[in-house]
Amino acid sequence: MAKMLPPPSQSVPSRPPSWLYIPPRRRHGTFTSSCAFRLSPSSPSSPPPPVLDFQYIQFMDSWIEQTSLSLDLNVGLPSTARRSSAPAAPIKVLVEENFLSFKKDHEVEALEAELRRASEENKKLTEMLRAVVAKYPELQGQVNDMMSAAAAAAVNAGNHQSSTSEGGSVSPSRKRIRSVDSLDDAAHHRKPSPPFVAAAAAAAYASPDQMECTSAAAAAAAKRVVREDCKPKVSKRFVHADPSDLSLVVKDGYQWRKYGQKVTKDNPCPRAYFRCSFAPACPVKKKVQRSADDNTVLVATYEGEHNHAQPPHHDAGSKTAAAAKHSQHQPPPSAAAAVVRQQQEQAAAAGPSTEVAARKNLAEQMAATLTRDPGFKAALVTALSGRILELSPTRTDPSLERR
């Protein structure tokens, strides 16, 4: 049996060595123990020395080199001897390769492609929106220029009409109606500017979804027609009168209230302004002025139509008497006399049925006009509330106030 001896550095024998000493060796992180074998011949009483088998020693060396018997901390990892030529891979990379490596799903790839397509489309839409925003101020400026030009043309046309008409004052409502009509006519007859020519041509081939613009234009045209229908009907009547009579009163069967008188430019005789006594329910107004050609003829201009019947005290007998009285006068030589005679003949030829039908149509037209007037309801409510407050018993009966 081999005997373990201390290393030669501790004790050096003085006699020739009779032992074979094998120092400890380090092989890849492991140590082998030191061994000493005796080389001197054995005594007859001692057992024979062991025979050293070098194949057994090589087997032990290979067994010691196994990684499973090493004492380092790289448990289960590849041996460092086998990876000595290549650099060691980090542990994070090995963990990611073992646990985080998975195959991409086809649905995920499809979603990524869809997201990329949507982002590209959003970029294109953003560019288009920026272009539209950049072009908007230019188009707005063109529209403003067109509107200002149309307004200036309308104002000029209104001034020209007021200067060429008969020299009386015009009410603000008539001025507003004229300005609106002139604006509509200017917008209707205005030539389209070059940026809007293509839009007008494309409107002819518009799809059903684009018919809203056409319907809006039709609605505007209908409103214009309704506004023209709502204009007060203007009629004139010529009556003989005494030149010395300065009252300018024309008896037509209705009651009137005079609210003004002024001298016009084209006629030295003054013009009187009357309003129906049923106002504001009845919107009819009357202007009376002597003719510039003949002082014996009064020209009565009526604006609108009465929405009520004549007062009851004005009967048919007075009408016939007045007609006979007018017929006794000699007709004036001017053109107004012919008009007066024509009106008298038409009134004599018209029967009672025609007058009733005319009154019925007049009532229907006035009712339609009042229902379309936004201020009619407010005026009616104000009048009724004032009348109710006047007739309220709390203001007249003190006994009710004590209660």
From Swiss-Prot:
Molecular function via GO: DNA-binding transcription factor activity; sequence-specific DNA binding
Xref: SMART domains: WRKY
Location of this chain's protein in the cell: Nucleus
Principal place of residence: nucleus
Region (Disordered): 157-178, 306-335
Biological processes, Gene Ontology terms: defense response; negative regulation of DNA-templated transcription; regulation of antifungal innate immune response; response to chitin; response to fungus
Any coiled-coil regions, as ranges: 101-135
Chain residues forming the annotated DNA-binding region: 245-311
Statement: the UniProt record of this protein carries the keyword DNA-binding: yes
InterPro entries, A to Z: WRKY_dom, WRKY_dom_sf, WRKY_plant
Composition bias type Basic and acidic residues, residue spans: 306-317
Stretches with biased composition (Low complexity): 162-172
Induction trigger: Induced by biotic elicitors (e.g. fungal chitin oligosaccharide). Accumulates in response to M.oryzae.
Annotated keywords: Coiled coil, DNA-binding, Nucleus, Plant defense, Repressor, Transcription, Transcription regulation
One CC-aspect GO term: nucleus
Motif Nuclear localization signal in this chain: 222-229
Similarity comment text for this entry: Belongs to the WRKY group II-a family.
UniProt note: domains: The WRKY domain is required to bind DNA.
Function: Transcription repressor. Interacts specifically with the W box (5'-(T)TGAC[CT]-3'), a frequently occurring elicitor-responsive cis-acting element. Regulates, probably indirectly, the activation of defense-related genes during defense response. Modulates plant innate immunity against X.oryzae pv. oryzae (Xoo). Negatively regulates the basal defense responses to the compatible fungus M.oryzae.
Protein name according to UniProt: WRKY transcription factor WRKY28
Gene coding for it: WRKY28
